[in-house]
């Protein structure tokens, strides 16, 4: 974002640190105790913003499950700010391995100047720091960016806190649901509605830059429109009127093409559309249902599900439709694959039918399981779990989770997130029912 100016503090190096890097891919790690100290402020209003920034940073670090923010009620040292050396013994006494000190100041141009330093209290060393200048109303993004820097320093991976979620917001009784496209921060804050609820909408999808989305709108019983909407300008245009489309297209990584499934003459096939010319190119052949395509991060391959062999399974093909390979071989029906932005895993929904009914599962697998016999792994299960999507760093999966109605209450749908390891499942708060989540890349 052009109105954010980054000024890296040169005397704070991110190149060396003493704490052992947290491995976020293997098993459940014990959370690292961290103290996020009150940010120093020059005025009462700056102090209020500083307190809110500390709350957001602490919440980000807590939600990811890798850090344990220590309550400020336990703090011994009362000094705040970045212009002094902390009393490390006081922080070690409350078991804080890491310390974040910061300051916030309103500049003459109306912007906020927000600074922070990350300390290793065990070796009494600075791990890094940064200064951000940005409009006052973007203080929350500054907090997310600081949390991202801390996450990156300690895990060695990029963070995911400064990102957005697009989803379908649902309201009203079960048989008369009003569905609107909604946008929110990754943690559920700043929720706003993108559509008015006058028509049924489904499967919103981000562009690679998170500035644009696709979504499907059932304008009438006979018309299924795909819209492209610019989230910055609000401008909306019709990509096409595609009878038989079931999911919104997914953008290619380069943003010039998209891929989708369309039902015609008893079969459903994968098509690629050139967004400039609106020209369609059919990628799959034969009889059956081929749907839910998702590009690999480099745009060279596409994963999709197909029932060409009787039961829906996962397949990979080149982006031109050649070299089709089946990659799932387990029992059950595989659906809604989503390729990790790192390229190392594919998430999917798996439905297993048994004597007591259907069980829904969210799983992950390697793109080429023949190289790893134990590549498939279920990480979440429930009455209804579906629509998996990935965090920008490919280490967290978000999905929709549903419960049935009963005599006392109607059914409900919510959005949940879970780590790639299968640990730390948590609800992402929304104003009401929610489905079809999609996670953006990190914001600019």
UniProtKB/Swiss-Prot annotation:
Pfam families: PD40, TolB_N. One of its GO terms (cellular component) is periplasmic space. One of its GO terms (biological process) is cell division. It is found in: Periplasm. Its main location: periplasm. The keyword Cell division applies. It comes from the Bacteria. PANTHER family: PROTEIN TOLB (PTHR36842:SF1), PROTEIN TOLB HOMOLOG (PTHR36842). The Tol-Pal system is composed of five core proteins: the inner membrane proteins TolA, TolQ and TolR, the periplasmic protein TolB and the outer membrane protein Pal. They form a network linking the inner and outer membranes and the peptidoglycan layer. Part of the Tol-Pal system, which plays a role in outer membrane invagination during cell division and is important for maintaining outer membrane integrity. Belongs to the TolB family. This is Tol-Pal system protein TolB.
């Amino acid at each position: 974002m052009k109105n954010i100016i980054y000024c890296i503090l040169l005397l704070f190096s991110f190149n060396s640190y003493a704490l052992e890097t947290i491995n976020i891919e293997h098993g459940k790690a014990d959370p690292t105790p961290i103290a996020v100290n009150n940010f120093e402020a020059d005025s009462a209003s700056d102090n209020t913003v500083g307190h809110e920034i500390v709350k957001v940073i602490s919440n980000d670090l807590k939600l990811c499950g890798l850090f344990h923010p220590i309550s400020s009620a336990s703090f011994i040292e009362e000094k705040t700010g970045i212009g002094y050396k902390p009393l490390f013994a006081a922080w070690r006494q409350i078991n804080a391995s890491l310390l974040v000190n910061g300051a916030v100041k309103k500049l003459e141009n109306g912007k906020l100047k927000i600074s922070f330093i990350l300390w290793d209290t065990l070796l009494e060393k600075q791990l890094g720091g940064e200064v951000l200048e940005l409009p006052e109303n973007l203080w929350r993004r500054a907090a997310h960016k600081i949390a991202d820097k801390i996450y990156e320093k300690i895990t060695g991976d990029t963070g995911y806190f400064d990102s957005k979620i697009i989803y379908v917001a649902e309201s009203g009784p079960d048989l008369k649901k009003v569905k609107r496209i909604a946008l929110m921060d990754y943690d559920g804050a700043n929720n706003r509605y993108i559509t008015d609820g006058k028509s049924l909408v489904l499967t919103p999808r981000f562009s690679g830059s998170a500035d644009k989305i696709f979504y499907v709108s059932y304008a009438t019983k006979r018309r299924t429109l795909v819209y492209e909407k610019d989230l910055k300008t609000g401008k909306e245009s019709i990509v096409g009127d595609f009878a038989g489309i079931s999911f919104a297209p997914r953008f290619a990584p380069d943003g010039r093409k998209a891929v989708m499934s369309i039902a015609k003459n008893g079969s459903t096939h994968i098509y690629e559309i050139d967004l400039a010319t609106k020209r369609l190119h059919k990628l799959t052949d034969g009889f059956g249902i081929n749907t839910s395509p998702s590009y690999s991060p480099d745009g060279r391959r596409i994963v999709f599900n197909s029932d060409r062999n009787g039961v829906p399974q996962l397949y990979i093909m080149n982006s031109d439709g050649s070299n089709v390979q089946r990659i799932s071989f387990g029992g059950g029906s595989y659906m809604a694959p989503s390729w990790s932005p790192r390229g190392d895993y594919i998430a999917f929904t798996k439905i297993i039918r048994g004597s007591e009914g259907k069980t829904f599962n969210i799983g992950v697998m390697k793109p080429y399981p023949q190289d790893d016999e134990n590549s498939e792994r279920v990480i979440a299960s429930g009455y209804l779990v579906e629509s998996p999507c990935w965090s920008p760093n490919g280490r967290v999966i978000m999905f929709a989770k549903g419960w049935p109605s009963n005599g006392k209450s109607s059914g409900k749908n919510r959005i949940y997130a879970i780590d790639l390891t299968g640990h730390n499942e948590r609800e992402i708060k929304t104003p009401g029912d929610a489905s079809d989540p999609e996670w953006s890349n990190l914001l600019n």
